[in-house]
């Protein structure tokens, strides 16, 4: 069964209430995790602080693999925020979905191309901003004509391609996972209680476990590519 999105019109613009709700919930969860992990800092970390320090070390490793730390250290907070936000967003639609009057209200916000493409545009725009800020406008613009001027149109195309692939890769993986979970759940309803337990629940649990793995990998890939694109804009050796 196909479920439509809850849409409202305001000042000539169309808003998806489900996306707005899930984006807000994702932000709140990330904020709560960050506050809980840093509420009482200790020299010997335990619990949530230990987890948060592991995340910082992991993102620090991503940055070090793409650019030198003197240049990339300032992007540590950005990287941690991205990987936590995308991971939480990817996980929200896995346990269940909520439908009200044929409208889908609870899902992963990253299962909507509008959300992922908007996030990709914001990230790529940020790389351009830091490219101009750290290298100067003239040196930044000259990068589009290096090593030869005729590469300029190809590099413009590359910028659009990077944005599209960054957003659509995330959307495609998460959306496909939720669609298959929905199909497996509906399979059980067609075969009754025994069929639901035997033919639906086990595949659902297996696919949910795989979707957790995919969602985690996609959060890593999104953050890694963000730092790769950032390195191309801010490093003088790119």
From Swiss-Prot:
Main location: membrane
Transmembrane segments: 17-37, 75-95, 112-132, 179-199, 202-222
SUPFAM superfamilies cross-referenced by the UniProt entry: F1F0 ATP synthase subunit A (SSF81336)
Annotated membrane topology: Multi-pass membrane protein
GO terms of biological process kind: proton motive force-driven plasma membrane ATP synthesis
Keyword Transport set for record: yes
InterPro entries with a match to the protein in the record: ATP_syn_F0_a_bact/chloroplast, ATP_synth_F0_asu, ATP_synth_F0_asu_AS, F0_ATP_A_sf
Localization of this protein: Cell membrane
Pfam family, one: ATP-synt_A
Gene Ontology cellular component terms for the protein in this record: plasma membrane; proton-transporting ATP synthase complex
Keyword Membrane applies: yes
Keywords: ATP synthesis, Cell membrane, CF(0), Hydrogen ion transport, Ion transport, Membrane, Transmembrane, Transmembrane helix, Transport
GO molecular function: proton-transporting ATP synthase activity, rotational mechanism
Quaternary structure annotation from Swiss-Prot or TrEMBL: F-type ATPases have 2 components, CF(1) - the catalytic core - and CF(0) - the membrane proton channel. CF(1) has five subunits: alpha(3), beta(3), gamma(1), delta(1), epsilon(1). CF(0) has three main subunits: a(1), b(2) and c(9-12). The alpha and beta chains form an alternating ring which encloses part of the gamma chain. CF(1) is attached to CF(0) by a central stalk formed by the gamma and epsilon chains, while a peripheral stalk is formed by the delta and b chains.
NCBIfam families: ATP_synt_6_or_A (TIGR01131), PRK05815.1-4 (NF004479)
Biological function: Key component of the proton channel; it plays a direct role in the translocation of protons across the membrane.
Family note: Belongs to the ATPase A chain family.
Protein name, per record: ATP synthase subunit a
